[in-house]
Design a protein with these regions (language model features):
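Mid-to-C-terminal secondary-structure elements
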Residues: 123-136, 149-286, 488-671
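Interfacial "coupling" helices/loops that link adjacent transmembrane helices in transporter permeases
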Residues: 14, 305-346, 693-731, 788, ...
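Membrane-helix entry/capping segments
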Residues: 1-4, 9, 13, 49, ...
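Small-residue-rich transmembrane alpha-helices
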Residues: 30, 34-37, 265, 346-412, ...
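Hydrophobic alpha-helical transmembrane segments of multi-pass inner-membrane transport and secretion
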Residues: 13-39, 286-322, 350, 430-455, ...
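Alpha-helical transmembrane segments of integral membrane proteins
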Residues: 1-22, 280-284, 313-350, 361-483, ...
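Membrane-proximal extracellular/periplasmic loop immediately following the first transmembrane helix
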Residues: 36-101, 216, 220-228, 241-243, ...
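Generic structural signal for small/hydrophobic residues in well-ordered secondary structure
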Residues: 11, 21, 42, 58, ...
Length: 801
């Protein structure tokens, strides 16, 4: 208790040092805590599943001359074949229905129409045997019958209201499938890649295969249809993977194709959320590289806060040297002094932890928004309290051990004469080293910020090869009734003054569509690479501003099926002149031959992480699920309202949904933009904490050099020369830190940029800019204390012992 009172008095007596110490630690602890919570949340995905470590997804890889493609899906008939091949395992399938509309019949005919962007699946009972769901009503066997649907509790309440039993009630899916509610499952946690809201029996889609890309053929592999396996405890996945190679050879060898080697393998459930090679049914994925980056930033920020504390504490120890000497003369031994100083450190850390909790609580909404985190963050949960206690103990030890050992080891005679500064208090070289480490970390973060922001700017301003501005994308149904209305709908859209062009299509030029197939060119055998597909009407080029390199667009008057290839396709076929491809023919899979009427200039069909793939654009009305509208930039809101009015007139049974193309493209880089923003925030925090560390070292130097400054002033030294004396040393330290930060930052940012096929080039400007920023901020930090020392009364300085 005595040590606690003494610690509190010292804390209150040295308000300036205490404020800086507590502030730096609080910011460091809060930042580290929030980052660790985010990382832990991402790592927790689907860990609530009972058989988490024994569940696998059966995925597909296909090797071609131009590389390997990965697909989260597997052919539909593989399910029964796998059950025969591996009777010891449990298999189940899940088929996604993205962006479907659920219609809930209401009294009076005013039906409720709800668009579910994610969460609608077709599932078989086997899936619910693998993944554990809490059934509030019904059982997995309910999904063995066609027309059966299971709802989550939250979804049932949204559709039918609270307190109403939904079992036995009717729904309609996309105005095509009549369904009866046969079961209710409890709500799943948000940290899952299987956000089941509506589960329709797989038997239902089997009877309506054309509606949801359900192709019961060994030649069709789609990430929409996925198969999962539950292996018995003790069963090694490696042995199963070896058998899957033989399984693939048996079932794929008869398929006519162009692959060099197609196979299946098991992907563990713990890897699914992080493996960016494959699609998931969740609304976002996080690569492990991102998690490692966030973890390192958290550790670095916390480490810098500890370094800052050490610097300030040792700087303060000079002013407390006489106190330590008196305590030793009065009988205190080194052990007692050590624990007193550690106690003071613990008190500071405790206050900092309380302040950190306040900062973290205020920052939670902002952090959740940045990282798109849906789960509620309970800062006072048992796990977080334990995490905070662990951080507090670690910080107390790391930040307190050196000052405690140093100050408790003062020679009492030297301390009473106030000559400790001559002994350098444990060596100023250590504190210089700590400042170098601080600024090396902060400069790494500054470089990372500059590079990430520059890459994001490059992406925003990159020439995509098509027009993405003021392009509105509508969703439309492809049922027979809606398809019959397409012509009249398009005609009315063109009458709207704000609409320049329209196109019915499967998807816009840039999308997450990965449709591809084997093909043959000019009556040759199948090529050894795949062609990617887009289906669109004749308005596609004008609506999206695509340019022809040769030939002409296909027209409705063409007597044979026709399409366009891109320049990447041209070059992979061994041609350089676009005109050479015009008039040639191309066959998709085992279908009919298509006339190539033109070559379109390359455009970026996906994220800039990927190179331009060989492309074939061809009309095919049954898959026109989107309508692209090029709008005049003036009066966009008015035009959108008129478009919605026309849509509702033609499709009253469907809810109107639309989005702008540029917003959809931005979603490709959502995680990268989040990372760039986090870099900005934590680079700023790192610089701030580093400047506090500088302030500590300058404070130490100002005390140590008090008499030297006085002598220099008496001998005629100017204020600027004294400021230069202080700044020179720190300039050298920062330059040294730059040469540590430079290679590390270059390595990490090169690795990050290598994920982008189209990227900026690292130049000296990024690194020199970071150095100049660090120097500028450091000089400002040093200047305050240096000027104060330079303008002090030299007479008082010369009296200093």
């Amino acid at each position: 208790m005595t040590n606690l009172k003494t610690g509190w008095r010292n804390l209150w007596r040295n308000k300036s040092f205490s404020f800086i110490n507590i502030t730096g630690l609080a910011i460091g602890i809060a930042a580290a805590m929030l980052l660790f919570i985010v990382v832990r949340y991402e790592l927790s995905y689907d860990t609530f599943q009972k058989n988490y470590n024994n569940i696998y997804r059966v995925v597909t890889s296909d090797r071609f001359e131009d590389g390997v493609t990965y697909n989260a899906g597997i052919p539909v008939p593989a399910l029964e074949a796998l059950r025969v091949k591996f009777p010891q395992a449990t298999f189940g399938s899940l088929h996604g229905a993205y962006g479907s509309q659920v219609t809930v019949p209401m009294p009076g005919g005013n039906d409720k129409k709800i668009i579910e962007k994610v969460g609608i699946f077709f599932a078989d009972p086997g899936f619910f045997s693998i993944f554990n769901f809490h059934w509030l009503s019904g059982s997995p066997e309910a999904l063995a019958q066609p027309g059966a649907v299971v709802l989550s509790k939250e979804t049932a309440e949204k559709y039918f209201g609270k307190g109403v039993s939904p079992v036995g009630k009717l729904l309609k899916l996309d105005n095509q499938l009549s369904l009866k509610v046969s079961g209710i499952i409890d709500n799943l946690p948000v940290n899952t890649d299987y956000p089941v809201k509506v589960a329709v029996s797989m038997e239902t889609v089997k009877r309506n295969p054309d509606l949801y890309n359900y192709n019961d053929d060994w030649g069709n592999t789609s990430s929409t249809h996925q198969i999962y396996a539950l292996l018995p405890a003790g069963q090694l996945p490696g042995a199963v993977n070896k058998q899957l190679i033989a399984f693939a050879e048996e079932h794929y060898k008869k398929r006519k194709g162009n692959g060099l080697g197609k196979t299946n393998f098991l992907q563990p459930l713990p890897d699914i959320h992080f493996d960016t090679r494959f699609e998931t049914f969740g609304d976002h994925r996080t690569g492990k590289t991102t998690l490692w980056t966030l973890s390192l930033i958290g550790v670095f920020i916390l480490l810098m806060a500890c370094i800052n504390f050490i610097n300030l504490s040792t700087a303060q120890s000079i002013t407390r040297s006489k106190e330590m000497g008196i305590r030793k003369v009065l009988g205190s031994n080194r052990r007692k002094l050590f624990w007193q100083i550690m106690g003071e450190t613990g008190l500071l850390v405790a206050v900092a932890v309380i302040l950190a909790l306040i900062i973290a609580r205020l920052s939670v909404p902002f952090v959740k928004h940045i990282v798109s985190m849906q789960e509620e963050i309970h800062l006072f949960s048992v796990t977080n309290i334990l995490l905070l206690a662990l951080i507090g103990l670690a910080v107390t030890f790391l930040a307190g051990i050196y000052p405690s050992l140093s100050m408790s080891g003062f020679n009492p005679i030297t301390a009473l004469k106030n000559k400790v500064m001559s002994a350098k208090v444990g060596g100023i070289s250590l504190r210089r080293g700590l400042v170098v480490l601080q600024f090396a970390i902060s400069q790494m973060l500054i470089i990372g910020t500059i590079v990430a922001v520059s890459q994001m700017d490059f992406i925003r301003n990159a020439d995509l090869g098509f027009n993405k501005d003021a392009v509105l994308m509508l969703n439309i149904s492809i049922d027979s009734s809606s398809m019959s209305k397409q012509y009249a709908f398009g005609k009315d859209l063109k009458k709207i003054p704000g609409v320049e062009n329209i196109s019915f299509t499967s998807d816009p030029p840039a999308s997450d569509n990965n449709w591809s197939t084997n093909f043959a060119f000019d009556h040759r055998p199948d090529e050894k690479f795949q062609v990617h597909l887009k289906f669109a009407d004749t308005g596609y080029l004008n609506t999206f501003g695509l340019q022809l390199a040769a030939g002409r667009n296909y027209e409705p008057s063409d007597t044979t099926r026709a399409g366009l290839i891109n320049e990447a396709m041209l070059h992979m076929l061994g041609m350089q002149d676009p005109a050479d491809a015009v008039g040639k023919t191309l066959r998709l899979g085992g279908g009919n031959w298509n006339l190539i009427t033109g070559v379109v200039k390359d455009f970026k069909a996906s994220s800039l992480r990927s190179e331009v793939k060989p492309m074939f654009i061809v009309p095919y009305k049954p898959v026109y699920e989107r309508v692209g509208l090029k709008l005049h930039s003036a009066n966009l809101a008015k035009t959108q309202a008129e478009v919605e009015k026309v849509y509702n007139a033609h499709f009253p049974e469907y809810a109107y949904t639309a989005s702008f193309l540029d917003e959809s493209i931005n979603e490709f880089y959502k995680q990268d933009s989040q990372l760039a923003l986090l870099y900005k925030i934590f680079a700023g925090l790192a610089v701030f904490i580093a400047c506090l560390g500088l302030y500590g070292l300058v404070s130490f130097m100002a005390v140590q050099k008090t008499k030297e400054v006085g002598i220099r002033k008496v001998l005629g030294a100017s204020v600027s020369s004294i400021v230069y004396m202080f700044s020179k040393e720190f300039t050298v330290l920062i330059v040294i830190s730059f040469f540590i930060a430079f290679p590390a930052a270059w390595y990490f940012m090169t690795a990050w940029l290598n994920d982008f096929h189209y990227r900026i080039q690292l130049s000296a400007g990024f690194f020199i800019g970071a150095l100049l920023i660090s120097l500028g901020i450091a000089w400002l930090s040093v200047a305050y204390k240096a000027i104060a020392a330079a303008v002090s009364n030299p007479v008082k300085a010369l009296r200093t012992e």
